[in-house]
Regions:
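Core dinuclear metal-dependent hydrolase active-site scaffold
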Residues: 1-39, 46-50, 56-120, 128-134
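Proline-aspartate-enriched helix->loop->beta-strand connector
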Residues: 37, 120-123, 127, 136-153
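Conserved helicase ATPase motor motifs in RecA-like P-loop NTPase domains
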Residues: 43-45, 151
Length: 153
């Protein structure tokens, strides 16, 4: 499995010649994103996480990934300020990658269960519309991944 940071909260995850792009962005202060993928997954529908126009879709073939989702919120007020956020868990080659999107709160035990012990945790740390670094540390400690990759800072 290959994991590539493309900017902001956008990553490409590849396995067996199949490429998934997570949270493609349009942010005026960042270089434009131009990439290709077999599949695009978005945590929520704000253009800094769901600018699918930046991704050229290549013909789909059978995906080596299994994808699990965990519903969370984009804020710490049950989604009343910024709505929902979908966490994606991608598994292939015996590895699991968790992309937390624009997580805005600490996770419940039920939300943590499918994330615990993942191989790579992609976690927002910026504190602006997401959890901050201190909260991110608590979330990461609860998930206990092999590797933590900060994003959205």
């Amino acid at each position: 499995m290959k994991l590539t940071w493309l900017g902001h909260s956008c990553f490409a995850v590849e396995s067996g010649g199949y490429r998934v792009v997570l949270d493609p962005y349009y942010v005026e202060s960042y270089p434009p994103l131009h990439t290709s993928a077999n599949e695009v997954l978005c945590s929520h529908h704000h253009r800094d996480h769901a600018f699918v126009e930046a991704v050229s879709l290549t013909p789909r073939k059978d995906s080596p990934f299994t994808v699990q989702t965990v519903e969370t919120f984009h804020d710490d007020k049950g989604g009343t300020l910024r709505g929902t956020n979908t966490v994606h868990v991608l598994a292939a080659e015996g590895l699991r990658v968790v992309h937390l999107g624009d997580l805005g709160h600490e996770l419940s035990g039920e939300q943590l269960a499918p994330l615990r012990g993942c191989d790579a945790l992609l976690i927002p740390i910026g504190g602006f519309y997401t959890i901050d670094a201190e909260t991110a540390k608590r979330v990461a400690d609860a998930i206990a991944p092999r590797v933590v990759v900060p994003m959205h800072y």
